[in-house]
Amino acid sequence: LIGPAFRYAEKNDFILKNPMRVVDKPSKVKKESSYYNAEQLNKLAKAAKGSYIETPVILAIVLGLRRSEIVGITWNNVDFANRLLHIKQSVIVGDSSILPQGTYRVIGHTKSHKSKDIILKYFLKTDSSERSFTINDALYNYLKALKAEQEVMIRETNAYKDFVCVNAVGTLILPDSITHYFTNLLDENGLPHIKFHALRHSCISLLANNTAFTMKQIQDYAGHSDFLTTFNVYSHADNSAKKTEMDYITSCFDDLFDDDNN
């Protein structure tokens, strides 16, 4: 409020010179990223079993995906034959008219009084965000079981039958719903409050804490656009044995994938 007041006073000749012009702006203090360690992620994974957001939580922990990337995964992106999961699109909620033609498809509308478009974008945050994961046995079995379960569910709508993250009646689980239910999940289980996006940081930090993985490997796994992003945020490696990235992540948890999904 002080700055605008002095500008108004100078403009209307109440003062000769705005003293705020010579005041240096304080430098922004970089906020440390809050994330979970392996023990906390283990507790979260157990708490998420059977919850509304079980699948989004698992995909965030194991793959370090963003909310929009998780919601955007379709079964066409899951290549069971070659054990590959392709991340190439995302889902957002908003006004589709501001997006370039041919870069998206409106797949539904929210049910709020101010209805918004549910948009499947054919592009991600950056070009490097488009990536493919080799699916290990644990995630392969989980996704196989999930697909089989969805094939026999009684759906309220078929609009989202190709999407991986749907609820018990086949409705797409939207990014904001993930955030809402994630906060409730933490409250109900007495877990420290973090943002859902912090699960991405948690996943990448687990890899960075393992000297078996180079920063380049971690950059590719995370889908960072440049090496410096990975290095500046996650350059705190210390120990562990050599494994593939996904094998290492899943090995950190006791029962991320329980027997029901194997």
Residues of each region from the PLM?
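Proline-centered turn/helix-capping motifs that create local helix->coil transitions or kinks
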Residues: A9-P19, V93-L99, A145-T157, N261-N262
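Active-site/catalytic core of tyrosine-dependent DNA strand-transfer enzymes
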Residues: S115-I119, T126-L191
